Amino acid sequence: MTRIRRGYIARRRRTKIRLFASTFRGSHSRLTRTTTQQKIRALVSAHRDRGKQKRYFRRLWITRINAVIRDNRVFYSYSRLIHDLYKKQLLLNRKILAQIAISNRNCLYMISNEIIK
């Protein structure tokens, strides 16, 4: 059986993979088989961690809101605040509430006082 020379197609494919893996360390950026495996692994990790990132940020927002809410001036818990927000139909998500809690605490206190009434 004669050997088939692949031509520019295989070279183009390998070049594309090498460009993707150019910032990897050691043989992970030089050897073709290793770069292919590392590319697959990198994309799997990126896909998995996009889901994790959403979870981590939600946890961070909840922690920030809870820390400000449990301050001395408002005798409220996070779960009661969210429950009352839904009852009053105030559509503020956790991200916005966390930004308000950090930048302008008085505004969050005003919101919670309006809910209590």
From Swiss-Prot:
This is Large ribosomal subunit protein bL20c. Belongs to the bacterial ribosomal protein bL20 family. One of its GO terms (biological process) is ribosomal large subunit assembly. It comes from Buxus microphylla. Binds directly to 23S ribosomal RNA and is necessary for the in vitro assembly process of the 50S ribosomal subunit. It is not involved in the protein synthesizing functions of that subunit. Keywords: Chloroplast, Plastid, Ribonucleoprotein, Ribosomal protein, RNA-binding, rRNA-binding. The lineage of its organism: Eukaryota, Viridiplantae, Streptophyta, Embryophyta, Tracheophyta. It comes from the Eukaryota. InterPro entries: Ribosomal_bL20 (IPR005813), RIBOSOMAL_L20_CS (IPR049946), Ribosomal_protein_bL20_C (IPR035566). It is found in: Plastid, Chloroplast. The gene is rpl20. One of its GO terms (cellular component) is ribonucleoprotein complex. One of its GO terms (molecular function) is rRNA binding.
